[in-house]
Swiss-Prot record:
Monomer. This is Formamidopyrimidine-DNA glycosylase. DNA binds at residues 100, 119, 162. It holds the Pfam family Fapy_DNA_glyco. The lineage of its organism: Bacteria, Pseudomonadati, Pseudomonadota, Alphaproteobacteria, Rhodobacterales.
Length: 283
């Protein structure tokens, strides 16, 4: 499933085609994705101007001139693809209609924005912009890891006394929004923390020290266009490249990249997810 860097990359890719532009026509090709699409969705979108595109955790929100916001969740295999007239650098020569093109937005200026989702685990909804943060998908989310509200004091306070593994704590969207399995594995490696270590055992300084590492990993991943492992593509159809710089994720049995370390990357399963780590470097 796309994590924060992938969703932010898609948001940035959509911006030239959508931000400030009118939706001249919307087409909905099926009534549901993961859940039923909102009633009269095509009618409610057509003629609306996109005021801005923003991201909350792993969700994209397009704020519309009529007072509603289009909430987009890519799910496991969803893609937002831009085709048609060249708008900025994010244009993909995407034939229409393709089999899994479920929602199509014809934009002012000639660009076409298509939501394509072969597995239909993605979702779309229309919500009042002023109440978007109360939507069930957003209401319980913690602060953004790249935002000002997420700092060392906050994270140290949230981890103090927690008797869950530090990996599980960082994946808890109520503590910090948008982190997923890939990037938490990479963060814990850089921090030298074993994924099974109890969050409450870190102490204030080590817990607070996770914040700059989280920011560093996410920023590097966004700069690389995210990580393409299976279905993820940028809005122009290109792959992300951060997977080529993974230090532990997906590297089971390979040598640790830490200079002087003779350990091999291991894999354990926590709550149904693979945790990649170096048993020598991470304690």
């Amino acid at each position: 499933m796309p994590e924060l860097p992938e969703v932010e990359t898609v948001r940035r890719g959509l911006e030239p085609a959508m931000a400030g532009r009118l939706i001249s026509e919307a087409r909905v090709n099926r009534p549901d994705l993961r859940w039923p699409l909102p009633p009269r969705m095509a009618e409610r979108l057509t003629g609306q101007r996109v005021l801005r595109l923003r991201r909350r955790s792993k969700y994209i929100l397009a704020d519309l001139s009529g007072g509603e916001s289009l909430l987009i969740h890519l799910g496991m295999s969803g893609r937002m693809l831009v085709s048609g007239a060249r708008v900025g650098d994010f244009v993909h020569d995407h034939p229409a209609p393709a089999r899994h093109d479920h929602v199509v937005l014809e934009m002012e200026g000639g660009a076409r924005v298509t939501f394509n989702d072969a597995r239909r685990f993605g979702a779309m909804d229309l919500v009042p912009t002023e109440a978007a943060e109360t939507h069930p998908l957003l209401a319980s989310l913690g602060p953004e890891p790249l935002g000002n509200a997420f700092d060392g004091a906050y994270l140290a306070a949230r981890l103090t006394g927690r008797r869950t593994p530090v990996k599980a704590a960082l994946l808890d969207q109520r503590i910090v929004a948008g982190l997923g399995n890939i990037y938490v594995c990479e963060v814990l490696f850089r921090a030298g923390l074993a994924p099974v270590r109890l969050a409450g055992s870190l102490g204030e300084a080590r817990a607070a020290g996770l914040v700059p590492i989280i920011r560093e990993v996410l920023s590097e991943a966004i700069e690389a266009g995210g990580s393409s492992l299976r279905d993820y593509r940028q809005a122009d159809g290109e792959l992300g490249y951060f997977q080529h710089t993974f230090r532990v994720y997906g590297r089971e049995g390979q040598p640790c990249v830490t200079p002087g370390c003779r350990g091999l990357v291991g894999r354990i399963v926590q709550s149904g997810r693979s945790s990649f780590h170096c048993p020598e470097c991470q304690r």
